[in-house]
Every structure is written in C-alpha cells, then in structure tokens.
C-alpha cells in the first residue's frame, strides 16, 4: 500500500530493503527446522531471539551491501520496534527513523494479553506433539491479539452492544 512506484515510499526513487525476520517462518532458519544434532524439529528448544538480535542481523545485511548510511528506517508494529532498536544501537546509520504503531516497551496490559495468547497456544493438545502445530491454540491467540490491534471505534463497531448482522439473539455464531 505504501511501498511501490509513485507511492509514499517510491521505488522509482529509493532502493528498498525488506528482509525476513531472523527466526521467522518465511525464509529464515527457525523453530520449524530440524535440529541437525537430534534430527527432530527445534520447536521450543530453538534459541530465543530478541528484537536486538533481529536488528543486528539487519545491520549485518546493510553492511554486506556496502551501504554506509540509510535514508530512512521504517516499520510498523514489531517492525516499528525494530526501527527504535536500530536507531538506538546505530544512531549514525540512518538519516531518519519512521517507527509506526509501536512503543519502546509494552504496557502491563500488553504483556498480560501476550501471556493470554501464549497460554492459549500451550493449552492446545498439539503443543508438545512432534510434527504437529497447535492450530486451535494459535487461533485463540490470534483472536486475543486482534483485540489489541483495534481502535476504540473499531472495537465498538465489531463488538458493540448492537446485534451484528443478526435479527435475533442466538446461542450460536452461525
């Protein structure tokens, strides 16, 4: 939406680097990979990765490209946290930082909601099973997380006291 030809981050004018998150599931080595020592999935034995670790890997990539200084570092949500960490670790590496929809630290409420999601995942019977995914727990965790993404107005529209596209009260959601 914001990145591309003639958009806010215009790829006709700027070279955009968008790397996968270290330890993520889309092209990076992570918990779904097999541990070469045990030939089993890493799963919960995979090393903990922090925002700082991710940013250090990103800086390594920038250095590998031979880029001396970036015009800007931009990101939203967890990407915004990476922007803040990058600017903190490498204050002279970019001319500007554009953190979007993030904060430097979580509130107690955010930490509690994240723990709710973790507990939902760990309560799933598939949590500890090898070669399976706790899909039901992940679904509940996503529902809890979704609440944190909505504005007050968005929450009211989605969960307000009026019936949502229904003519009468029911005990089911169908």
Walk through the language-model features, giving the residues of each.
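Alpha-helical scaffold segments in carbohydrate-active enzymes
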Residues: 60, 85, 89, 143-146, ...
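Alpha/beta-hydrolase
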Residues: 110-174
């Amino acid at each position: 939406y914001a990145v591309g030809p003639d958009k806010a981050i215009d790829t006709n004018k700027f070279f955009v680097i968008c790397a996968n998150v270290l330890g993520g599931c889309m092209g990076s080595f992570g918990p779904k990979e097999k541990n070469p020592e045990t030939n089993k999935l890493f799963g919960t034995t995979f090393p903990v990765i922090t925002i700082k670790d991710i940013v250090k890997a990103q800086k390594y990539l920038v250095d590998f490209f031979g880029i001396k200084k970036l015009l800007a570092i931009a990101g939203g949500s967890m990407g915004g946290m990476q922007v803040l960490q990058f600017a903190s670790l490498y204050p002279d590496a970019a001319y500007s930082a554009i953190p979007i929809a993030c904060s430097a630290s979580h509130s107690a409420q955010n930490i509690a909601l994240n723990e709710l999601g973790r507990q939902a995942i760990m309560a799933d019977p598939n949590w500890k099973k090898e070669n399976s995914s706790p899909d039901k727990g992940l679904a509940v965790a996503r529902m809890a997380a979704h609440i944190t993404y909505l504005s007050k107005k968005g929450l009211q529209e989605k969960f307000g006291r009026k019936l949502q596209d229904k003519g009468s009260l029911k005990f089911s959601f169908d």
